[in-house]
Amino acid sequence: MKTIFNYMTIMALLFTFTGCEEEEVMTFGEERGVNFVIYEAAYGTYKDDYKNLETEYNFFKEYANNTTMELPPYQVSIGVQLEGEFSDKPLKVKVKAEPVEGYEQLAVELPEEVIVEAGEYRANFTVACARPSVYNEECKVKIVFDYDNSDVIAGTKERQEYIITLKDEAIWEDMYVASLEEWNEMYSPYIGTAGEVKVRFIYTALKNINYHYAWTNSLYYYIIMGRPTWGFTATEMDCLRTQLEAYNASHDAPLAEPDGTLVTFPN
């Protein structure tokens, strides 16, 4: 009887160990889950923060960094991170863009594919986002995984989408006013009536004489402080008129506001 008992005990233990081994194999399967993570391109670092998988950006200051009104796309860097074991072969991750309910969808350019190299568990990619076509309106896009065309499966639920929000909204307070109407009230006697296009063109035009964003805004400050002869002097006005002439000569239609009003500067 003792021999039978010992035999049964040994068999039970073997069964238990075998069950544990099978469970481990099931847990670490060949399919890897994937998640979005934050990628800080300036530092080349990743950050797993599922509560902040989003980017918000206002194009307005970019006019001061360019000499034309045709702004380049804004580049958004995004990271991806695998769950589970390292892979001994490269894994293809495909992403796609989806609309966000209630918002105009951004026009974006996505990479053909993202590759997580063998022995790695992270990779990053860039989304090129065009400037919204309408001023002062937020546009959004949702970047998600395209699992039908990827070598991976879904990872953690909270890390399956990345939201990009862009706008081209005038920052009136940087020009020391609260609105376009107040801009015209304060500055039109010196540089003429303005609209959304004109206030942006001023930045790009003055960039041609190496004025940066803050420097251009200082011209408004001088007017506010009662020193109009210090702001928008003959030098700045000559530049604005010259650049406007150059723009109109190089485009099929002269520079105009969305309602068709031509952009002009006083002589």
What would you call each of these model-derived segments?
Residues 2-10:
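Sec-dependent signal peptide recognition
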Residues 21-91, 99-106, 124, 131, ...:
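Intrinsically disordered, low-complexity regulatory regions in eukaryotic proteins
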Residues 108-113:
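Active-site-adjacent structural elements in folded domains
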Residues 142-144:
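Extracellular recognition modules
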Residues 15-19:
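C-terminal motif of bacterial Sec signal peptides marking the signal peptidase cleavage site
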Residues 114-122:
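Short proline/glycine- and polar residue-rich coil/turn motifs
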